[in-house]
UniProtKB/Swiss-Prot annotation:
Single GO term (MF): phospholipase A1 activity
Tissue occurrence: Expressed by the venom gland.
Proregion span(s): 5-14
GO cellular component: extracellular space
This protein's name: Phospholipase A1 2
Location (main, coarse): secreted
Function text: Catalyzes the hydrolysis of phosphatidylcholine with phospholipase A1 activity. May act as an allergen and induce hemolytic activity.
Entries under PROSITE patterns matching the protein: LIPASE_SER (PS00120)
Active site, per annotation: S153 (nucleophile), D181 (charge relay system), H242 (charge relay system)
Reactions accelerated catalytically: a 1,2-diacyl-sn-glycero-3-phosphocholine + H2O = a 2-acyl-sn-glycero-3-phosphocholine + a fatty acid + H(+)
GO biological process: killing of cells of another organism; lipid catabolic process
Segment forming the signal sequence: 1-4
Localization of this protein: Secreted
Amino acid sequence: ADDLTTLRNGTLDRGITPDCTFNEKDIELHVYSRDKRNGIILKKEILKNYDLFQKSQISHQIAILIHGFLSTGNNENFDAMAKALIEIDNFLVISVDWKKGACNAFASTNDVLGYSQAVGNTRHVGKYVADFTKLLVEQYKVPMSNIRLIGHSLGAHTSGFAGKEVQRLKLGKYKEIIGLDPAGPSFLTNKCPNRLCETDAEYVQAIHTSAILGVYYNVGSVDFYVNYGKSQPGCSEPSCSHTKAVKYLTECIKRECCLIGTPWKSYFSTPKPISQCKRDTCVCVGLNAQSYPAKGSFYVPVEKDAPYCHNEGIKL
């Protein structure tokens, strides 16, 4: 999983400066469907030259997953999410593997320079995702309303850059972007052009789980602050809380129960009790969040163990 905790020390274990430079040819696409549950690896160029997607696949909703710093496209948490998306909603899942640009080869170092390179690479990956989207729309006739992006950490901001680029290409907007604890370091003071922003898709959902490694301001149509968005139950390290955002969404996709967000005006205010929640005031985290009318900031209480719900018997 992603590990921004390496930034805390700011030193190198091996006394070297990592080279996290990469180009488009280094990016792989891990494609999952009910026919290929374990995934196959493709390159964008192959998709351009051959009709590899069947019409039956393309007609489904498509989720494009984008990992973050030090991670890979087939990390165990994304793999679990892909399987849930396939099993529950028959999605076509495409995980963008930009591990070289995310410094995955230097996972044992405590390096600020490597992270800075990875931050710079997010724009290039965002453009790649937008160009890939253009291919889906123009060659495979996929409507933009069928495509959502799900990005964790740096991948959340990468999703935002892709969202900006598809609009520049006049393709329209993605149906949704879900930002899973969008990365904080190097983004804390950034304005919309330089981070994930609510205008990057028709609907932007952000799930905040770590005040140390994630941003602590609103970036979406709805911003869920799980356990006040600071640290998560059962986690002693910031990286654990940072990764919990992925696990929470996966459980929400399974729909065993609903993580309920209750209106929360600011950090200094008291969240509205879940017992007072109604469908027009509160929101369930997950793929159906758009179906609820409320927008803004929401506090989400959780339990320590999966499926994490702490709903006091309330159903929306």
